[in-house]
Structure formats: C-alpha cells, structure tokens
C-alpha cells in the first residue's frame, strides 16, 4: 500500500506539478454538481489553476474548459497532500448526527457555502454546472415531446426515505402527462420502481447522457436529488416535489416550481426518521403536480432566472 501511494504521488506530481491545495466534497451527484458551480466561480476569478479537485464522477469533467486538475477520488491523494503540507479543503453544507438522524444545515445556499469555503468573494451564481458538447445534446433528443419523470430517490448513494412520495401518485402524474400527448421518459436507478407507462431508461444512461436528455426535454418532474441539480445545470424547467424535509433555499433553485408541504414540524432535516408519517409529502396531491407541470409547459421557451448571492 505504501509503495502504491508513493508511486501514485510521484506520477501525479510529475504530470500535474505541485498542488496549491486539494478539494473534496460529498459523495452525491447533486453535491458534485453544486461543487462544480462553485469551481466555476473560482475559475472565472482566475483562481482554480493549481488546485486538485477530487471527483467521484470523472465523466462530469470530460470535457471541461475550467482550470484545475480533476482526479478520481482516492484517499491516497489526500494523504499525499497532507504529507506535502498542502491544504485539504473538505466542502460541506451540513453536519449530520447519525444518533439523532439530524442534518444540521449551515446558513445559506450550498453553492454559496462551497464558494465561501473555497475563498470566493463577491457576486456569485447559485447554479450547478456541467458542459455538454453539441453532439451530446443532439443525442439527448429521443422523442418529439419528451419530458423526464423521476419517481423515487431510493437509488441515491445516501437514500433518504423522508423524500418518498407515493408511487401510485407518480403513476397518475405519468398518466396525465401521457394523456396530454407527451413522451414520458423515466430516468433514475434500476433499484427504483418502474413508472407506469413511461419509457424506461432507469440505469441505461450515463450521467452525461442523462444530462443531454434533460437538456433536450420540455420539463423535468421529480424529487430533490441528483437529477434535480442535473436538470438545473442544463436549463431544463422543473417541477420538484419538495415536501418539508428541507427549505428549498438550502440547495434548491428559484427557477424551479418547488412544491412544499409546511406542517409545524417542517423543516426537520431528518434523513430517515419521520414521527409524523411523512405528512409534509402527503400534503402534496397528484393534482398539484399535474397542474404545476402543465403551467410550466405552457411557459415553454421562457429564459430561466439564475439565483445569485454576494459573498462578503
């Protein structure tokens, strides 16, 4: 193991030079996309060069015009940085206590928090980031009137049962959209339940292919998670069944239609423990989602506003 670490370190230093610092983030796709938004802000200020960014999704960065070095996540690289006395920045926007199941959020939007932790100052855009080639975008057009629906987040690396919305309601949403003449595509993990009547692409796309499909879709309807962030990164309008677990101001986007439930216990920031039978999700009916989706489809072609913040 030591020999491997030494060989890895020598190879990286020879190829990329001495790092100014090493940056790592959470394991989720959405977290990585929000990190990409913060890195973009670092890059436009000319301060991304010389930084090693550790990624669990290398394909997100191929290609990229951003400065910096993007390396597959490896704890050996962190150990190397520590031996070289290079700063290691561990990005995060909450502190999770497994004993209480409580995810205590840091103040502000996650992208703003990441920017602050990276030393970015001034006006920033609260938008995740991915670059697609024209050929990739063209490949995302699968059907004439395509919309994307995600009916579960159970396939996430850190699944949160408090985000669950009943499967039968998702099936009714799918039926209504198909009744409107739309081609409903289901994206997500093969571990998630099939959506009745949808074109099933669960587990059959890469992250970049999913991004391209979203980029060429009229609408995304889904839950808080990686696909929500991916849709925002490619400017796909979205209706998000948010519920009440968290405030959209933490990691959501004003460009989306965010459907929230606000019982007295909300926001709770629990991951799996709900003593109230997910009342915040139950408050959102399928008619609410269908109405919101139809409203967004009627506004097709509108330029999506970009949220901003100022980091002091």
Language-model region placement:
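Catalytic machinery of carbohydrate-active enzymes
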Residues: 1-312
């Amino acid at each position: 193991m030591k020999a491997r670490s030494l060989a890895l370190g020598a190879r990286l230093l020879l190829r990329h030079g001495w790092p100014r610092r090493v940056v790592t983030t959470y394991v989720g796709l959405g977290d990585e996309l929000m990190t990409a938004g913060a890195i973009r802000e670092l890059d436009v200020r000319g301060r991304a060069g010389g930084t090693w960014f550790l990624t669990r999704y290398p394909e997100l960065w191929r290609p990229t015009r951003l400065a910096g070095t993007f390396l597959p996540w490896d704890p050996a690289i962190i150990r190397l940085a520590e031996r070289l006395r290079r700063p290691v920045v561990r990005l995060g926007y909450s502190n999770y206590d497994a004993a209480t199941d409580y995810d205590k959020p840091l103040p502000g939007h996650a992208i703003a928090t990441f920017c602050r932790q990276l030393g970015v100052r001034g006006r920033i855009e609260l938008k995740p980031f991915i670059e697609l080639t024209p050929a990739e975008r063209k490949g995302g057009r699968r059907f004439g009137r395509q919309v994307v629906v995600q009916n579960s987040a159970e396939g996430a690396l850190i699944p949160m049962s408090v985000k669950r919305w009943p499967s039968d309601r998702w099936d009714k949403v799918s039926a209504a959209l198909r009744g409107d003449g739309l081609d409903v595509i289901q994206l997500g993990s093969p571990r998630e339940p099939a959506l009745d009547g949808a074109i099933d692409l669960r587990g059959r796309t890469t992250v970049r292919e999913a991004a391209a499909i979203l980029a060429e879709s009229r609408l995304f309807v889904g839950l808080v998670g990686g696909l929500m962030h991916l849709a925002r990164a490619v400017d796909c309008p979205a209706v998000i069944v948010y519920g009440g677990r968290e405030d959209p101001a933490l990691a959501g986007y004003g460009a989306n239609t965010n459907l929230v439930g606000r019982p007295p216990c909300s926001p709770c920031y629990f991951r799996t423990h709900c003593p109230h039978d997910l009342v915040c999700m139950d408050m959102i009916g399928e008619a609410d989602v269908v109405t919101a989706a139809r409203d967004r489809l009627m506004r097709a072609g509108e330029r999506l506003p970009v949220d901003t913040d100022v980091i002091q």
